[in-house]
Amino acid sequence: MLFRSNFYADETYEHQVIPGMVYISHPTEYGTLYTKAELEAIYTICKEYEMPLFVDGARLGYGLAADDTDVTLPDLAKLCDAFYIGGTKVGALCGEAVVFTKKAPKFFFTTVKQHGALLAKGRLVGIQFDTLFTDDLYMEISKHAIRLANILKAGVLAKGYKLLLDSPTNQQFIIVDNEKYAELKKQVAFSTWEKVDADHTAIRFATSWATKEEDVQALLELL
């Protein structure tokens, strides 16, 4: 939180936007994870400066189900002030479940309504999460996607490809040359992530609840 200290060291800080919250994602956009120790350290500093810690959990299931994680759902609830459980990336039609770990803000329902985010049939969102958290379905879906992502990772490494980074979740970032990139664009849906150099690009593949093992094998054949 060096930024926070430097912020108040500036005598004109009142003319600036006041830092009000720390916002992180778990997993991150790169599929990487925070460790429990890292979350503890971040939350300790947040409390020191009386700033809430919010965790973006759009891909939370894939973080909790990762083989190498040491962060559980109860851990997360203790180490932040609010987080949300993403639904769409594990098969829900829409919606997220917001979790306030201490005390919900006053008039939260009204605030949601004022921002045009209140569904007339809110139970449609609730039913989805009730189903996802019945019989451990949420974790089963997440583990399925990670298992297939690991098959993809092992396959591309065996073929001699390099990874942009080592992601333990359902997102895999593969570096391909320009020729292979152009070829794949005609056959496969993926995200163009970043140019590694003039001749290579990192592309992202994300497995999900809907991915089948034969899909991964077909992709590996194209690669």
What are these regions (language model features)?
Residues 1-2:
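Short, small-residue-biased leader/transition segments that mark boundaries at the very start
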Residues 18-28, 33, 70-159, 164-168:
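Active-site C-terminal subdomain of aminotransferase-like
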Residues 21, 52-54, 82, 202-204:
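Structural preference for beta-strand elements that scaffold enzyme active sites
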Residues 28, 59-61, 89, 211:
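Active-site-proximal loop/turn and secondary-structure-junction residues that shape catalytic pockets
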